[in-house]
């Protein structure tokens, strides 16, 4: 496994192309990491690349093809970043709940892979400002994309969208109407819901891209058994940095322009 132990390796990881329009670097920025001085870097980069690629190719690309540019609010979280956020009430679930979700490079308790991102779809923001509901896009995704879970929030129509090798197919929301919109076993789970999203753009399939040639990607990708993965490191985070202080480039690589 290629451990990220130099800045040059971090740059190489950021250049890995996950899909036609997304690169690994798009998902590494974290406000928690930047403000509190915590490294948001995968401990198992090959696994993070694989699950991130599945998320992008199966979910994010078709969304962007159909509705236009999407905005990534939160993507990958290292175990350290996620644990800090959970312990300090920064809207992060526990590490155990986020393995196979925001923590892309560690599988869930059943050893299954997954990846999640929190996104904003500007098209949905405009739609809701005109009186539409987030539920319309939720049903559109349910009918068209192989998502595992969706969780909508009250601001900007933002939502978590997750890919998983064993999809749950469940939609929840903190925004009104709150609660579970659908899950397996509910009477509204099957069939078409086209009447819920009348007037939506026609579905456009996702574009494809050639796989990135990177030292972090084996061909074919082979993962170490779950039993051989080292336990996530969760070192105490540094104290908050005051506004105006520059953060180290290794913490927030997005600040540095590179080719």
Which stretches of residues belong to each language-model region?
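Generic secondary-structure transition motif, activating predominantly at the C-termini of alpha-helices
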Residues: 14-17, 32, 89, 142-145, ...
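Proteins with a high burden of low-complexity, intrinsically disordered sequence enriched in S/T/G/P/A and R
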Residues: 19-25, 43-48, 54-57, 188, ...
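Catalytic cores and adjacent binding grooves of peptidoglycan-active enzymes
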Residues: 103-259
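Cell-envelope/glycan interface and biosynthesis
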Residues: 29-142
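A broad, structure-centric signal for solvent-exposed, well-ordered loop/edge residues
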Residues: 17, 25, 79, 126-128, ...
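N-terminal, Lys/Arg- and Ser/Thr-rich interaction peptides
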Residues: 2-44
């Amino acid at each position: 496994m290629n451990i990220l132990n130099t800045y040059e390796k971090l740059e190489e990881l950021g250049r890995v192309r996950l899909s036609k329009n997304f690169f690994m670097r798009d998902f590494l920025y974290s406000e928690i990491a930047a403000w509190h001085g915590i490294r948001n870097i995968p401990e198992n980069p090959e696994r993070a690349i694989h699950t991130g690629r599945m998320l992008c190719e199966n979910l994010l690309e078709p969304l962007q093809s159909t509705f236009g540019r999407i905005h990534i609010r939160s993507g990958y979280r290292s175990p350290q970043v996620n644990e800090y956020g959970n312990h300090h009430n920064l809207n992060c679930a526990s590490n155990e709940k986020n393995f196979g979700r925001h923590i892309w490079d560690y599988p869930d308790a059943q050893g299954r892979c997954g990846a999640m991102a929190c996104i904003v779809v500007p098209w949905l923001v405009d739609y809701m400002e005109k009186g539409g509901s987030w539920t319309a896009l939720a049903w559109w995704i349910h009918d068209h994309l192989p998502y595992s879970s969706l969780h909508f929030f009250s601001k900007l129509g933002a939502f978590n969208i997750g890919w998983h090798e064993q999809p749950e197919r469940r939609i929840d929301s903190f925004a009104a109407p709150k609660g579970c919109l659908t899950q397996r076993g509910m009477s509204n789970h099957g069939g078409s819901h086209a009447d819920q999203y009348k007037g939506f753009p026609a579905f456009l399939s996702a574009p494809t891209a050639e796989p990135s040639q990177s030292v972090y990607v084996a061909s074919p990708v082979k993962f170490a058994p779950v039993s051989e993965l080292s336990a996530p490191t969760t070192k105490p985070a540094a104290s908050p940095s005051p506004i105006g202080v520059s953060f180290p480039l290794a913490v927030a690589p997005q600040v540095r322009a590179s080719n």
